[in-house]
Design a protein with these regions (language model features):
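Post-signal-peptide, soluble extracytosolic/periplasmic N-terminal scaffold domains
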Residues: 9-188
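Short acidic, flexible loop segments centered on an aromatic residue
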Residues: 18, 47, 55-61, 166, ...
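Low-complexity, acidic Ser/Thr/Pro/Gly-rich terminal tails and inter-domain linkers that flank the onset
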Residues: 18, 166-184, 341-369
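Solvent-exposed beta-strand/loop surfaces of large extracellular or lumenal domains
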Residues: 19-22, 58-83, 131-139, 212, ...
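Short beta-strand elements of extracellular/lumenal beta-sandwich folds
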Residues: 27-39, 185-198, 285-286, 290-305, ...
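Beta-strand-rich interaction surfaces with strong enrichment in secreted/lumenal proteins
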Residues: 28-32, 80-82, 150-151, 177-179, ...
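Intrinsically disordered, low-complexity Ser/Thr/Pro/Gly-rich interaction regions
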Residues: 207-211, 227-365, 390-394
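C-terminal soluble interaction/assembly domains
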Residues: 356-440
Length: 440
């Protein structure tokens, strides 16, 4: 006799989802572990379970239970598997016309079946118009992924066990929706988390945690590969109930109520209440990204006085703006994990009325290990009503460098980047010119 431990018998289920196609599952069961109920079979585990990560321990005091052997069985029932196991065994086939053909299955390859019948060898086209009957399920095939343990020790009729494991096929990311107000001076922000479960198991009434941060993982091949199936999407519109806290060098978001995470489902839950954040629309020119275009970005500080001040997990930030009676999509960008008091820059798109052109107008050798360049950047504003300031981002890779002169103020951002702020009048043009000395 074996004991089947299914999801319905779960005392508690804990699910932790990472940003890296990884989930941590912990389930507590009260099971009969006495010798007459062994081996112990534990079903409804994730199909993409990582076997080497499985950990079984007893929570019952005084128990002497020990694990001698562990097996992860994932040879699941399918028509292909059944026929594969029935090679050299008798089968019965009913054709489209109702004819019964009995014989020994010799081969099932591609779109054909080869049978040895009393009349000889028969080759039949394999399609959905055939009905194939077999006596029983072949040994070794199972209906659900299963963990099987061989145990030592006396055990108990009611022993509380904790099973934990890692699984591939689980992911989450944040999704942000921002509605621009007052010409970009503020943004109404909604934040969601999207949990994508394709691990091959459903977790009922689970205690959910999300880990924001990059966990280092060793390069190890997955134990099981699965085809992606059709997915459903569930959206939870209730008030946000995530508690956020620091954990090691990461951030954890814990849902304060149980939730069911179905297999092949994307679940969306509000991350925090809607907020209005002070923001600024800025224009940037970076010739290394696009030599002709000027980008428009929405910039805000992730701080309390701006209306936010919360750790922002990595995700896609989508922006909308009102046009008369409707909202229109104006652009999206990917943001990285962003801590409190850090600046967020969202590239919305290219400014239609702004253009730029960069030229090296002079270049001379100063010494055998240095040279001087004069660079000119022309910025054009074709909007007849709006003055703008364009931030010019210049990337410099020439060892030791020095800006000898510039007709606009600049800030050295780091060892390889400098920024110039250039005001451009409506329907006007401005030229940035600076001299660069490079040494190597």
């Amino acid at each position: 006799l074996t004991l089947l431990a299914g999801t319905a018998l779960a005392d508690e289920t804990y699910v932790t989802v990472y940003n890296q196609d990884l989930g941590m599952i912990k389930q507590v069961r009260t099971l009969n572990t006495r010798p007459d109920n062994r081996p112990l079979r534990f079903t409804d585990v994730a199909a993409q379970l990582i076997p080497a990560s499985v950990h079984l321990r007893t929570l019952t005091g005084g128990s002497n239970l020990q694990v001698l052997e562990q097996n992860f069985e994932f040879d699941l029932v399918s028509s292909e598997k059944i026929l594969e196991k029935y090679v050299d065994h008798p089968v019965e086939i009913v054709t489209e016309g109702g004819e019964l053909v009995s014989g020994t299955l010799l081969s099932r390859k591609g779109n054909s079946l080869v049978l040895k019948t009393a009349a000889g060898i028969k080759i039949m086209a394999f399609n959905d118009k055939l009905s194939i009957q077999v006596k029983e399920l072949p040994q070794g095939l199972i209906t659900r992924p299963t963990l099987i343990w061989e145990l030592a020790g006396q055990g108990a009729a009611e022993e509380k066990l904790e099973v934990s494991y890692l699984t591939a096929g689980m992911n989450w990311q944040a999704a942000y929706v921002g509605i621009l107000e007052d010409e970009g001076k503020s943004v109404d922000l909604k934040a969601w988390v999207s949990i994508d479960n394709r691990c091959g198991a459903t977790f009922e009434n689970a205690h959910l945690k999300l880990v924001a941060g990059e966990v280092h993982r060793a390069a190890e091949p997955r134990a099981v590969q699965r085809m992606l199936k059709a997915e459903t999407m569930a959206e939870e519109k209730a008030a946000p109930q995530f508690e956020e806290r620091r954990f090691f060098e990461y951030h954890i978001y814990q849902l304060e109520r149980p939730t069911t995470i179905k297999d092949n489902q994307i679940k969306q839950i509000a991350l925090f209440p809607d907020v209005t954040v002070k923001s600024e629309k800025k224009f940037f020119y970076n010739a290394s990204r696009d030599p002709k275009k000027v980008e428009v970005r929405l910039v805000f500080k992730n701080e309390e006085k701006a209306g936010l001040g919360k750790p922002l997990p990595a995700g896609i930030f989508r922006l909308y703006q009102k046009d008369q009676k409707s909202l229109e999509f104006i652009g999206e960008d990917q943001i990285e994990h962003t801590g409190r008091n850090e600046e967020v820059k969202i590239t919305v798109g290219n400014a239609f009325d702004l253009a730029a052109e960069r030229k090296v107008i002079e270049q001379s050798k100063v010494t055998s290990r240095s040279q001087r360049q004069t660079i000119e950047i022309e910025l054009r504003n074709n909007n007849p009503k709006q003055d703008v300031t364009i931030v010019v981002e210049e990337s410099i890779y020439c060892g030791d460098w020095q800006i000898e002169s510039s007709n606009f103020t600049y800030v050295k951002k780091d060892i390889n980047q400098v920024e110039f702020s250039v005001p451009v009048k409506a329907d006007g043009t401005a030229k940035l010119r600076y001299s660069l000395l490079c040494r190597w």
